[in-house]
Regions:
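Substrate-binding/access-modulating region of protease and related hydrolase catalytic domains
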Residues: 164-178, 182-303
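Autoinhibitory N-terminal propeptides
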Residues: 1-166, 171-178, 184, 215, ...
Length: 303
């Protein structure tokens, strides 16, 4: 099973999002109860407490998925929760030197003191999976002064809860500690779902973060309007938080056009040019994710 498409657990369950028909949240909760799934099993994705009844994120038995099909009176749609794409490069960072922040610290006595910085990425301490104490890699980073320790240790609001991950968030925090060694550093995962990431942004704001950075892109996020993550970012910046994202520039990896009907009898097909309703793609061997979107409403976003 492709881990870039599906998130599975050891119980034969897949992580899904259930888009609830308007006003039917309690009905869906009752329905899930017949599968022995209860609100305590839901993944935390409450960004706006006044608007938490559109989407339920939960692990669901794979073999029982067809049993949801008859309940269109309660459920608008169900889809898998795909992991976001981390925008990481192939070269080790020399960010402190490249942006001359090392010179700024010397010339203006800047250290990041009294500044809170939040990081959103896949994980902080999950390279060996979920564990109850600090992993060896984190302890080593603190001992090597790559991360702050003692009273100024990184505050982890939520680490990735679903198994092992790459700890890219810890790598980002190492860079920030180089640049601003006295800053207070915070981390939360954004690797569970869009709703969970949006909730994480709000939690970092509530924690008093002055700056938030992330390196994630959700391919299912709306292309033609703001989604729940963008709404959370907009709310953060409206409160004075500086937000920086390496969301990725996919412009040169995409195709966008207004619909142009093909000639009869294929009028419902898009004409890519020259009467061609089939766009040819040449791909090298490997794994690819192709995302298609139309400028339509998103029911899960209330439109």
């Amino acid at each position: 099973t492709n881990e870039f498409i599906y998130t599975l657990n050891e119980n034969g369950e897949v992580l899904i999002e259930i888009v609830v028909q308007s006003g039917q949240y309690s009905g869906v909760v009752s329905l899930l109860g017949t599968f022995n799934i209860f609100p305590g099993d839901f993944i935390s994705d409450v960004y706006d407490p006044n608007d938490d009844e559109r989407v339920i994120t939960v692990f669901f038995p794979i073999l029982r998925l067809p049993d949801l099909n008859p309940h269109t009176d309660l459920i608008n749609q169900v889809y898998e929760v795909s992991r976001p794409i981390p925008n990481t490069g192939l070269i080790s960072s020399q960010g402190d030197f490249a942006q001359n922040s090392d010179i700024a610290r010397l010339g203006w006595k800047l250290s990041g003191k009294d500044v809170k910085i939040g990081v959103i990425s896949d994980s902080y301490d999950r390279i060996s999976g979920v564990q109850n104490s600090l992993g060896d890699a984190v302890v080593r980073d603190i001992d090597n002064l790559d991360l702050p320790g003692g009273a100024n240790s990184v505050t982890v609001l939520q680490d990735y809860p679903l198994g092992a991950a790459s700890d890219e968030g810890r790598a980002m925090l190492q860079i920030l500690h180089d640049v601003a060694p006295e800053a207070e550093l915070y981390f939360t995962t954004g690797f569970v779902s869009e709703g969970n990431m949006a909730a994480g942004i709000a939690e970092l704001v509530d924690a008093g973060c002055d700056i938030i950075v992330d390196d994630l892109t959700y391919m299912k996020g709306p292309f033609y309007r703001d989604g729940i993550v963008a709404d959370a970012v907009n709310e953060a910046t409206s409160l004075g938080v500086s937000y920086f994202s390496s969301a990725g520039n996919f412009g040169n990896r995409s195709y966008e056009a207004n619909f142009s009907a093909s000639a009869s009898p294929n009028g419902i097909r898009h004409d890519f040019g020259g009467g061609n309703s089939l766009q040819q793609l040449q791909l090298e061997p490997g794994q690819y994710i192709i995302a298609l979107q139309w400028d339509d409403d998103f029911y899960s976003l209330g439109s």
